UniProtKB/Swiss-Prot annotation:
EC number assigned by the record: 3.2.1.23
Glycan-bearing residues: 28, 95, 247, 375, 406, 427, 451, 682, 740, 771, 784, 826, 883
Cell compartments where the protein resides: Secreted
GO molecular function, one term: beta-galactosidase activity
Principal subcellular localization: secreted
EC class (word): hydrolase
Family per similarity comment: Belongs to the glycosyl hydrolase 35 family.
PANTHER family on file: BETA-GALACTOSIDASE RELATED (PTHR23421)
Keyword GTP-binding listed: no
Keywords for the protein's UniProt record, in alphabetical order: Carbohydrate metabolism, Disulfide bond, Glycoprotein, Glycosidase, Hydrolase, Polysaccharide degradation, Secreted, Signal
Coiled coil: none
Pfam families in the record: BetaGal_ABD2, BetaGal_dom2, BetaGal_dom3, Glyco_hydro_35
Record's protein name: Probable beta-galactosidase B
């Protein structure tokens, strides 16, 4: 019956005339009507909202004091919400602990800040999240096979996730919109398109998946979640969990789509191998998909491409330009033309894969080519995205639209296509224009055929043609309502507007040097009160001859060079004309915490690098933000405002002829970093010695003769590190044997870019250096007969560095030694026993502040040499050199002070490079105890490693450590330097006391020798 009903709906939607807006059913989850939705959009507390969100992950920036920086940058750009994954593994170091209290593990500050800043929250707690994170966010203790194949209704898996999911649901429930908070949706699972056996069109349900979803949904509801439950489709083929597609009891309230139309990785060859030829800027038809699969729900992207991750072996510095500002310009506008009214950009801020957070597909950086860079920089992509997000927040008519038509018939140039969407209630219309072949970057000009309340005609009527130059799109509006005024049309794009003292101020923009034309109903004449590189301004007053002959209108054509111009109409309306660069630095900070920002609850500010907030008290406006240099600032505010405070300092202010306020921002303080060094060092591989005693608390007998893992080893005992509670990074194996063995066959698996080295009785046998596209290595290592002892135990030492656990079904792929076979002339040699060491304390999580991802099993890590407060007085001096010969592992330390002044935001990165004659080494960068980067020059190209304040102590001493693992007898040589990414005058306090984030060394570490 559900099939027939759905087919009837889809047929009607695709071939009948558009329904009236009030004829579409308004849905809720039957628990309340606080969050509702229909065919057009979400509605929150009775108000429709264009949900433009961006994703970020608190666990990739584990400094709570910096979360406000990310949220303020999201808000300032015009976003109305943010998405956030909660990472089960980060909070559950073992199967008896769920930590939502220690340091950055406490997410409640984020949920409180969201309310204060004025952003809705799309909370995404998994339990599986993918996210290019180790095992997709599964705690690594569930990867052994002991909990089944995962992501089903297996009772063992259910028992694993329930404590975590119960706790996060309890926490989130207190911050829901229904209880006065700002959490508006709750995503169940992630990209779990497994509802159907075979084609979704057959609708034969896969019961283990459906029952799993029912368990998750019931748990959320039982623990207080009463907002809509959401699922996200991994692609346009899965069609799972949607009520418009089936009547399954496992369905959620609202379904969103995940789409990455450009390559999701900086390695374009990966996309070519998966989806065929990669064509940059090639768009996808989403309108038909949404109409067919979820016609009574909003067209909703739970994830839409915000960038691409950089894999091991990817290009230095990240992705090519086809994922930059032009991508944001074209693809996000394309989505508007597809009637999308809810988008979550993945990622808006990527952050860092510190410790062992990363899955094997990605290195330490999770910059993701995001609008906000890993080092917290905002640049061209952020500003280009802001041009649209400010518009979607201001364009109320955009929230309810029907697709009127699409094609080349709307343009005088066949090289241009147009999608026309119209609000059926207000007649506000949006013409989304782009190249007919979307991948084209030709320079095209055209007129647009529009149908307005004043009749049908082609625009511009007087000025120069509309221009699309390069990979660009433009949204041309007609009958655009703003305040009490209506824009009959504008070939310049609308940036934003606000209503001050009852009269709107409208901001329009064009690319630098281009022309625009706008027509305002009700105007008769206007004056140019500021002309900064403007030209060709013409005024054309006329009477409306169609709808109302008594209504006048004023049409203005112009060309705008670099700068800002201001025109004032006889109605009092101010129109601010901006070129692209000036629009980048034009802001509309809200005066209250309503995410939708009512039209009379913002001011307009031109000039600063960033405007974080605005508050008016009497005649004073208090602005906070960032400034890069001495620069002008201009504020459009209510007439009562006469005084500007910037970051709590009063500015010398003057008033313009068009009633704005002008002032100058001061130069930020000068900051210089001290030199790193001198360095001290110590050996960090005593385990390779034949007589090393592996009897401390660090070591466990690797003696399992069976495994729950679905992939059994070729030889026994089981030498899978996770079996013994060691899950991260470097693990050290010691295998004992007697007899006349001549070599060993080793198969080691550790994920893309992993590596290992082997020593026999202290002598190097060989190494696997790693490969960015290979997950395991099968080597035969011959023994030098002179190194084999015939009278005592021989010890084979394997140092194995994995790069994380695979995602999705690959989470159970073992990490460790899959085969260890001794070779001998008489085949009698066998290993007598094995010992293994990994993270100090194993799963007991002896460093709860930094958490379960931070450390591996290197001797230096187990002993705490990377931690502040460790006494290295007895170590050897290295001076400024970090180099040695021979196949070994050494650890280097230095302490360096910082004294960053207040009033500035400073971003710092470390730079690592190889020196000497070899790059066959692996290294880890530690900053005040945090592993902030893996530098593996044989495999990867990442050389820059940002470290945020809080991890760095900006007003005290900092302990910097580097492990160097030489995989050949040539040794290793590394250079460590650091640099300032930016210094900005800022309201953000980066000199806060973050000592609690940097717990120091204790003697407890001595037991893990």
């Amino acid at each position: 019956m559900a099939q027939l009903f759905t087919k009837i709906i889809v047929y009607f939607l695709l071939f009948a005339s558009p329904l009236l807006a009030n004829q579409w059913p308004l849905h809720n989850n039957s628990l309340n009507d606080v969050v509702q939705w229909d065919h057009y959009s979400f509605e929150i507390n009775g108000q429709r909202l264009f949900v433009f969100a961006g994703e970020w992950h608190y666990w990739r920036i584990p400094v709570p004091e910096l979360w406000i920086d990310i949220l303020e940058k999201i808000k300032a750009a015009g976003f109305t919400a943010f998405g956030i994954y909660v990472n089960w593994a980060y909070h559950a170091p073992n199967n008896y602990t769920v930590d939502f209290a220690t340091g950055a593990h406490d997410i409640t500050p984020i949920l409180k800040m969201a309310k204060d800043v004025g952003l809705y929250v799309l909370l995404r707690p998994g339990p599986y999240i993918n996210a290019e994170v180790n095992a997709g966010g599964f705690p690594l203790w569930v990867t052994t096979g002991e909990y089944g194949s995962l992501r089903n209704d297996d009772s063992r898996y259910t028992a694993a996730w329930e404590p975590y999911f119960t706790k996060i649901s309890e926490i989130a429930s207190e911050y829901q919109i229904t209880k006065g908070g700002n959490v508006v949706t709750y995503q169940i699972e992630n990209e779990f398109g497994d509802q159907w056996t075979g084609s979704p069109s057959r609708r034969v349900q896969y019961e283990p998946a459906a029952k799993y979803m029912e368990l998750l949904e019931a748990n959320a509801r039982r623990n207080g979640i009463d907002i809509p439950l959401v699922a996200n489709e991994p692609n346009m083929r899965a069609i799972s969990w949607g009520k418009d597609w089936s009547n399954s009891s496992a369905n959620v309230d609202v379904v969103g789509l995940d789409s990455y139309p450009s390559c999701w990785t900086c390695d374009l060859s990966v996309c070519t191998g998966t989806t065929g030829e990669y064509i940059a800027y090639q768009v996808i038809d989403y309108y038909g998909y949404f109409q067919e699969t979820q016609p009574t729900m909003p067209s909703f992207f739970a994830e839409f491409q915000g960038g691409s991750y950089n894999p091991w072996g990817g290009p230095v510095g990240g992705c090519p330009e086809d994922i930059g500002p032009d991508f944001a310009n074209l693809f996000y506008r394309w989505n508007i033309g597809q009637r999308v009214t809810a988008i979550n950009l993945y990622m808006l801020y990527g952050g860092t894969n510190w410790g062992a957070i990363a899955a094997p597909v990605v290195a330490s950086s999770y910059d993701y080519s995001s609008p906000i860079s890993e080092n917290r920089t905002i640049g061209a992509k952020y500003y280009e995205t802001k041009l649209l997000t400010m518009f979607t927040r201001a364009a109320r008519d955009l929230i309810v639209t029907d697709l009127i038509g699409n094609g080349t018939q709307y343009s005088t140039n066949p090289a241009i296509q147009t999608h026309v969407i119209r609000n059926p209630i207000t007649n506000g219309t949006f013409y989304v224009t782009l190249h007919t072949i979307s991948s084209s970057s030709t320079d095209e000009t055209f007129q647009l055929h529009v149908n307005t309340s004043a009749g049908a005609f082609s625009i511009p009527r007087y000025g120069n043609s509309i221009r699309l130059n390069g990979h660009q799109s433009k949204i041309i509006v007609t009958d655009f309502q703003f305040g009490t005024h209506k824009l009959l049309y504008s070939t310049a794009e609308v940036l934003t507007y606000t209503v001050l003292d009852g009269i709107p101020t409208l901001a329009l923009w064009v690319p630098t040097g281009e022309s625009g034309e706008f027509s305002v109903l009700g105007g008769k004449w206007a004056s140019v009160l500021r002309c900064e590189w403007c030209s060709d301004i013409q005024f054309h007053p006329e009477q409306d001859q169609t709808s109302n002959p008594t209504v006048s209108r004023l049409t203005v054509s112009f060309t705008q060079g670099q700068g800002m111009s201001v025109i004032k109409l006889d109605t009092g309306l101010r129109v601010v004309l901006l070129d692209r660069e000036s629009a980048y630095y034009f802001w509309a900070p809200a005066l209250n915490s309503d995410p939708s920002v009512p039209e009379d609850q913002s001011v307009l500010v031109q000039g600063p690098h960033l405007v974080r907030s605005a508050k008016i008290v009497g005649s004073t406006i208090r602005l906070t933000g960032d400034s890069a240099q001495t620069s002008p600032i201009e504020v459009f505010a209510p007439k009562q405002v006469r005084i500007i405070f910037w970051n709590d300092k009063e500015l010398k202010t003057s008033k313009t002829s068009y009633d704005s306020l002008q002032a100058s921002l001061p130069q930020p303080a000068y900051v210089k970093l001290p030199l790193l060094g001198p360095w001290k060092y110590n050996g960090s591989l005593p385990e390779k010695a034949q007589d090393y005693k592996d009897t401390s608390a660090a070591w466990i007998s690797a003696d399992h003769m069976k495994t729950s893992n679905p992939s059994p080893p070729a030889t026994f005992p089981v030498l899978y590190a996770d079996e013994y509670g060691f899950h991260n990074s470097i693990r050290i194996w010691r295998g004992y044997f007697t007899g006349n063995a001549t070599g060993v066959v080793l198969k080691v698996q550790g994920g893309y870019a992993f590596g290992f080295s082997g020593w026999l009785n202290g002598k190097l046998l060989g190494s696997y250096l790693g490969n960015a596209s290979v997950e395991h290595s099968h080597l035969t290592l011959p023994f030098n007969v002179s190194h084999v002892s015939t009278s005592s135990d021989n010890v084979l030492v394997i140092v194995h560095d994995d790069t994380g656990h695979d995602e999705t079904t690959g989470a159970l792929n073992p990490r460790g030694i899959l085969e260890a076979t001794l070779l001998s002339d008489n085949s009698s040699s066998k290993f007598s026993h094995w010992r293994v060491a990994g993270t100090a304390g194993g799963e007991t999580n002896i460093d709860p502040m930094r958490g379960p991802y931070n450390e591996g099993g290197l001797y230096a890590e187990r002993m705490g040499w990377h931690l502040p407060g460790f006494n290295d007085n007895a170590w050897s001096d290295a001076g400024s050199k970090l180099n040695f010969t021979g196949a070994d592992i050494k650890f280097y330390r230095t302490t360096v002070p910082l004294n960053i002044p207040k009033g500035v935001d400073v971003s710092i990165s470390f730079e690592l490079s190889a020196c000497g004659t070899t790059n066959a080494f692996r290294s880890q960068l530690f900053v005040n105890g945090y592993q902030m980067g893996r530098f593996n020059p044989w495999v990867g190209n990442q050389i820059e490693f940002p470290v945020p304040p809080g991890i760095l102590d900006y007003t005290g001493d900092n302990t910097i450590g580097l492990s160097l693992w030489a995989q050949t007898e040539d040794g290793a040589c590394a250079i460590v330097d650091w640099k300032i990414n930016y210094v900005l005058g800022s309201s953000l306090d980066v000199t806060f006391n973050g000592e609690y984030l940097r717990p120091g060394w204790t003697s407890e570490r001595l037991q893990y020798s």
